[in-house]
Amino acid sequence: MTTEIMNELKSKMEKSIESLQRDFAAIRAGHANANLLDRVSVVYYGAETPVQQLAGISVPEPRMLLVTPYDKTSIDDILKAINMANLGVNPTSDGNVIRITVPALTEERRKELVKEAKKEAENSKIAIRNIRRDANDALKKAEKAGDITEDDLKSFSDDVQAETDKFIKKIDELTASKEKDILEV
């Protein structure tokens, strides 16, 4: 019972960290990165489709992305979706490929991005704390049901807190790394 609770706790916390890493990857740090287009979806034959499924994305230069559609007829739809995604980039098309020039970030924009990264990190910390609360509630129910003793409850609650602290520390490390990446000129 308690092993299941701890395994579920770790699994959910790891998923929360993975989600944060995906969110951080989508925050552009002033250099071209294929992850910049992760959240861009294109309406293609009536269905929302991620741009990665419609085109090859490469980084030929530090400040340029090259989007090569597999189906040339989708190029206008992809261009429109990139423009509507409000990524702060200027895509241009020559009919065969889309070139996205990633402009250098201003100091003000860098600070906004750091603030956004910190907000994402705080949301992840809240998720981790909610997972901790759920695990502690499950342990208390197990104790009331007589599945574990009061001493076991204390011991497992300490384990839950140790896991929580470990994942919060990981979030802080990821945030510091992303902040450094964003502020690097």
UniProtKB/Swiss-Prot annotation:
GO terms for cellular component: cytoplasm. GO terms for biological process: translational termination. The keyword Cytoplasm applies. Pfam families: RRF. Keywords: Cytoplasm, Protein biosynthesis. Responsible for the release of ribosomes from messenger RNA at the termination of protein biosynthesis. May increase the efficiency of translation by recycling ribosomes from one round of translation to another. This is Ribosome-recycling factor. The lineage of its organism: Bacteria, Bacillati, Bacillota, Bacilli, Bacillales.
